[in-house]
Amino acid sequence: VNGDRILSNDNGKVLFNGNSVKPSSTNILDDAYISVNMRIRDMDNEKKWLISLLREIRYPRFLGSAALETAYVAVGKSNAFIQIIPNLRTFDCIGALFLVKSAGGWIEFLNNDIDNVDLRKPERFSYVAASNSTIGDLIMSFRT
């Protein structure tokens, strides 16, 4: 968006503009900056838990780019990104999810198992990427 560079390899280190970074340590929803893709048309079950969750988040946002918002979780600019609708293709999000995992963040696929993703198939995904397991588990506690 503004010339920032986010890089990683499989050594568990994520660089933001050349500096080593880690996800945020915030573990209270009311203090968290959480991005949510609000497109929930035709998803009645998902609407219920999302509305309950949004009541607990002080700073819900949506920038319009799942990859950027997921990458922001890895570098500590955001505490979580929630993609409720399974409409992201592998190449839309896999790089950013790699950043979150490399940085020590938390990822939960909502419609698939992350270990069974076949990059050659045209699957679509929904997921929660969080800065830590505490925030991730709090978010998932709203999903029934």
Across the structure, where does each feature detected by a protein language model lie?
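Short acidic/polar mixed-charge low-complexity motifs
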Residues: 3-5, 19-20, 135
